[in-house]
Amino acid sequence: MASATDNKEKQKALDSVLKTIEKTFGKGSIVRLGDATRMKVETISSGALTLDLALGGGLPKGRVIEIYGPESSGKTTLALHAIAETQKSGGIAAFVDAEHALDPTYAAALGVDIENLLVSQPDTGEMALEVVDHLVRSVAVDIVVVDSVAALVPRAEIEGDMGDSHMGLQARLMSQALRKITGNIGKSGCTVVFLNQLRQKIGVVYGNPETTTGGNALKFYASVRLDIRRTQTLKKSSEEYGIHAKVKVAKNKVAPPFRVAEFDIIFGKGISNVGCIIDLAEETDVIKRKGAWYSYQGSNFAQGREKAIAYMESNIDFAKKIEKQVRDHLSQGALVSANSVARVDEIEEDEDEDEALEEE
């Protein structure tokens, strides 16, 4: 065992080296973990209560986040909702539109304050990532969305001829940029969201042939990776009015990973938060469902999920009351699984059965 004298000498040496490090690199360059003022990671709401639950509270601040999936699966919608939630809490948001496809009308419909949203439409991948770096270093921006990694075309590729080969250029660009900006992201508390597309690996016989663009660097640097898929198209008669999306938390460094959340995305309106509330209210027994009928405190208020959503949208006070009770249940540690929210197709089957019985 070390003697008391040895321990004093060690402590003296430790204090000396800590002072030297702080003097050289600045105060806060090294701290004891127990002395940290912010042990809990702050979060931004994703706009979907079910996804917030799966993420352990929401999208973490001061981290790199990747959202990937097939085309028209809801990637940009999810990012715009995160921007809207940031702006609601008084934050400043920026959108780096590398795809040159941002629709201001749709963004406004989702609740984004387009008058104060910072937008950049860069010509090259280098320019886009330099813009992100400057915004992060400013410590004035709370969230930056890059749409998308696949559209971050290196300058050499743009200036070259159409048939030229540029093997690994984009991957090297992403790797260099992430090495440069990740440290600043943590210090500034700015959340950087990269949207990404899927590609197919050639010659894969066993395992998943899908991969994301931009190399492997983003997979390592991202604290959260969300895999979003369209599982169902929502229809009224023959008219399509939205999609049912399923998000798998493929990676999470701030909460348990591999959770799954489901929610509706309505065309022109975005994520149906009321739908999320109904699903979680049913799980926490705030609302009961028998067959297709939904009831609250013993009284039926709607038949079928669509009518229940319509009822709550037209009765805002009732919806807020249900949401408050759901959040209270969740804060008290209610056993709710993000993997088992109500499935639209299952409910519709129940509704069809009930309607058939009524006709008989």
UniProtKB/Swiss-Prot annotation:
Gene Ontology CC: cytosol
Binding site for ATP: 69-76
Database matches in InterPro entries: AAA+_ATPase, DNA_recomb/repair_RecA, DNA_recomb/repair_RecA_CS, P-loop_NTPase, RecA-like_C, RecA-like_N, RecA_ATP-bd, RecA_C_sf
GO molecular function terms noted in the UniProt entry: ATP binding; ATP hydrolysis activity; ATP-dependent DNA damage sensor activity; damaged DNA binding; single-stranded DNA binding
PROSITE patterns per UniProt: RECA_1, RECA_2, RECA_3
Single biological process term from Gene Ontology: DNA repair
Pfam families: RecA, RecA_C
SUPFAM superfamilies to which the protein is assigned, alphabetical: P-loop containing nucleoside triphosphate hydrolases, RecA protein, C-terminal domain
Matching CDD domains: RecA
Record key words, sorted: ATP-binding, Cytoplasm, DNA damage, DNA recombination, DNA repair, DNA-binding, Nucleotide-binding, SOS response
Location relative to the cell: Cytoplasm
Family: Belongs to the RecA family.
NCBIfam families given in the database record: tigrfam_recA
The protein's role, per its UniProt record: Can catalyze the hydrolysis of ATP in the presence of single-stranded DNA, the ATP-dependent uptake of single-stranded DNA by duplex DNA, and the ATP-dependent hybridization of homologous single-stranded DNAs. It interacts with LexA causing its activation and leading to its autocatalytic cleavage.
Protein name: Protein RecA
Originating organism: Trichodesmium erythraeum (strain IMS101)
